[in-house]
């Protein structure tokens, strides 16, 4: 099962003509199924392992989001990259876990499309990893090649676009984009390449990059879309999205958390409910012309059902 030019072209047309709705949080949804240590193959917390050990759990999460009415889901591959996988000593399984994650999402999307004929797409998630090349934690070429394996697996599994997400370091972001490009060249595939950055409550990326600098650095790489996800709720994203709307020459996306987490006796909770997220995204679409909307940490199928 591989990416097809027809599906990718349909996604491009949809992004150019209307607002496409993506899914919400993945990790918390997986944890709600209470996977065992055996499910994790003794790699507790490595959600990507579930793509091969418990594909039924991953498929059920995708099904819940498609059931809520979203147009596309992200693959369960946020940590299927060199640095994150190396933490579990499974860097050699990046391609395997990426392909499996994309295949599960693709099969679920096709199942729902088969029911009503409505197109549904798969966004291949390429997460930031756990090392910052700008600080010398890892060599640029190492993570670039790791991202190429990540992207090749996603394309082989049937992803319709590649989403470089939650980026915190511009050098890491560039490595992700170049790795994705090399994967497309190696496989003879062309799909939309989306980049979503994480900006802290301080107003900058983790390493201090401002929104203008990030746009200037990334837009010339030939990406198809740029935007924000994670780290904050929609309120804290407003000014950054305003800047992108004024200065970017490519379409925009927004996938905020359900507000800023609050500590309670039961642990962290996200305060923004479904209506709050929907209202914020509606405002962003109206004022900033977003093409792709969704949710990140703390968002659920109920949030997305209201957003749809």
What residues fall within each predicted segment?
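Domain-level signal for soluble alpha/beta catalytic cores
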Residues: 1-308
């Amino acid at each position: 099962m591989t990416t097809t030019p027809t599906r990718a072209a349909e996604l491009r047309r949809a992004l150019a003509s209307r607002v496409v709705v993506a899914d919400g949080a993945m990790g918390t949804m997986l944890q709600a199924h209470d996977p065992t240590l055996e499910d994790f193959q003794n790699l507790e917390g490595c959600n990507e392992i579930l793509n091969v050990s418990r594909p039924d759990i991953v498929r059920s999460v995708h099904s819940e989001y498609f059931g809520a009415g979203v147009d596309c889901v992200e693959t369960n591959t946020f940590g299927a990259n060199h640095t994150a996988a190396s933490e579990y000593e499974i860097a050699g399984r990046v391609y395997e876990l990426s392909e499996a994650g994309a295949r599960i999402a693709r099969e679920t999307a096709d199942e729902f499309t088969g029911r009503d004929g409505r197109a549904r797409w798969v966004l291949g998630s390429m997460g930031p990893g756990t090392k910052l090349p700008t600080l010398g934690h890892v060599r640029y070429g190492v993570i670039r090649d790791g991202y190429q394996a990540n992207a090749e697996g996603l394309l082989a599994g049937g992803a319709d676009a590649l989403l470089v997400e939650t980026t915190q370091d511009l050098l890491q972001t560039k490595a992700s984009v170049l790795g994705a490009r090399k994967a497309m060249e190696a496989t003879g595939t062309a799909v939309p390449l989306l980049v979503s950055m994480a900006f802290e409550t301080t107003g900058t990326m983790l390493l201090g990059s401002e929104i203008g600098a990030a746009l200037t650095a990334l837009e010339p790489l030939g990406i198809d879309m740029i935007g924000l996800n994670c780290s904050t709720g929609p309120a804290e994203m407003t000014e950054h999205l305003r800047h992108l709307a004024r200065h970017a020459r490519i379409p925009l996306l927004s996938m905020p958390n359900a507000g800023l987490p609050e500590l309670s006796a039961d642990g962290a909770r996200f305060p923004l409910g479904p209506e709050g997220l929907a209202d914020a995204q509606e405002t962003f679409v109206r004022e900033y012309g977003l093409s792709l909307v969704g949710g990140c940490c703390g968002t659920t199928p109920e949030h997305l059902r209201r957003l749809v």
